[in-house]
A protein has these predicted regions:
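Flavin (primarily FAD) binding-site architecture
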Residues: 136-145, 290-302
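Conserved small/polar residues in nucleotide/adenosyl-binding loops
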Residues: 307-309
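Short glycine-enriched, charge-decorated loop/helix-capping segments at active-site entrances
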Residues: 62-68, 146-150, 242, 300-302
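Beta1-alpha1 glycine-rich phosphate/pyrophosphate-binding loop at the start
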Residues: 2-97, 193-238, 285
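A conserved beta-strand/loop element that lines the FAD pocket in flavoprotein oxidoreductases
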Residues: 87-94, 254-266
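Active-site acidic short loop of glycosyltransferases
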Residues: 126-127, 268, 280-282
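Helical element adjacent to the flavin cofactor pocket in flavoenzyme catalytic cores
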Residues: 80-83, 243-257
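FAD-binding core/adjacent interface of flavoenzyme oxidoreductases
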Residues: 2-16, 88-187, 285
Length: 309
């Protein structure tokens, strides 16, 4: 790691103003791009984007990746290429700490899929720091969510769900025994925009998948989708008329909509409801809430709102 004792953030330093944007989501990426096109191109600022991923996919598309309806390679934006085209620098890494006195963002080491280190710990000096790292899944302390449910926050998670869905269908198609109740049941916990859109997309995608030769699976009988929401209605942040229209549409597709239903636990067996019922489910998606990343709580002097709990 660079020597943190050096006054790298000193206002007396020479050279262009250093702007570091942490987080390459929609907001952070657009900001880095615009700053690069205006200030970076003319040498008036040194713009750096930091992200733990190597490419960007617009988050509202993740439900389509999960359903297998969208080819990620056709929609991802490579950070290195974007940086080259728009006059900023990309750093592969994740924010783990902040030295505000010396104006240094601390980046943790990164590793590949086999556990080999790709980049060491580093210190990224800045004059202006923008934190745009977005949110992470909030399981509200519900037992079993981390072990038995798949969130949809990243491309990797969406791809993981899609692989498990494909494997579940192939298993059902080739097994000798009859398809068991709940075997091809997908339970989606959380009926905000992500959960609701996923339910509709899965209905279409699974029936298309079965049409490609999986003749042992009856989509109307064997493929079950359940959308679970603790609030009195789905899409609770939207006007009630839209919620009612979406409910009617989903139920018309055969999706079981369970509003006003609380989840007490998720196990290998399925979803346990607060009223004692158990929904046997082969796949469980958790889209019930978000919170600020844990690193925000470790940044000295940063004021937090209630969403970071």
């Amino acid at each position: 790691m660079p020597d943190a004792s050096q006054p790298q953030g000193s206002p007396l330093r020479e050279g262009p103003h250093r702007i570091v944007v942490v987080g390459g989501g929609a907001g952070g990426l657009e900001l880095a791009t615009r700053l690069g096109d205006t200030l970076g191109r003319r040498g008036q600022a040194q713009v750096t984007l930091v992200d733990r991923a190597r490419s960007h996919l617009w988050k509202p598309l993740l439900h389509e990746v999960a359903a297998g309806s969208l080819d990620v390679d056709d929609h991802e934006l490579d950070y290195l290429a974007q940086a080259h085209w728009h006059h900023f620098t990309y750093r592969y890494g994740e924010l783990v700490g902040l030295d505000r006195a010396r104006k240094i963002a601390l980046l943790g080491p990164t590793f590949d899929e086999e556990g080999r280190q790709v980049t060491p710990e580093r210190a990224e000096p800045y004059d202006t720091l923008v934190i745009a790292i977005g949110s992470t899944t909030n399981d509200f302390g519900t037992p079993g969510v981390r072990d038995h449910a798949i969130p949809l926050e990243t491309t990797g998670q969406a791809r993981r769900f899609n692989r498990r869905l494909l494997n579940a269908c192939i298993r059902a198609q080739t097994q000798a025994e009859p398809i068991a109740p709940g075997q091809l049941h997908v339970a989606i916990i959380g009926a905000g925009a992500t959960g609701t859109e996923l339910a509709a997309e899965l209905h279409r995608a699974t029936r298309q998948l079965v049409a490609y030769g999986m003749d042992r699976i009856d989509p109307e009988r064997d493929l079950r989708l359940t959308l679970i929401e603790a609030a009195p209605r789905i899409l609770p942040a939207l006007p009630e008329r839209l919620s009612e229209a979406a409910t009617k549409l989903l139920e018309g597709l055969g999706v079981s909509v369970m509003a006003g239903t609380r989840v007490s636990a998720v196990t290998a067996e399925g979803v346990h409801l607060a009223d004692g019922r158990v929904l046997s489910s082969e796949l469980v998606v958790w889209s019930a809430g978000v919170k600020g990343p844990a690193v925000l709580g470790a940044l000295d002097g940063l004021e937090l709102s209630l969403i970071h709990i």
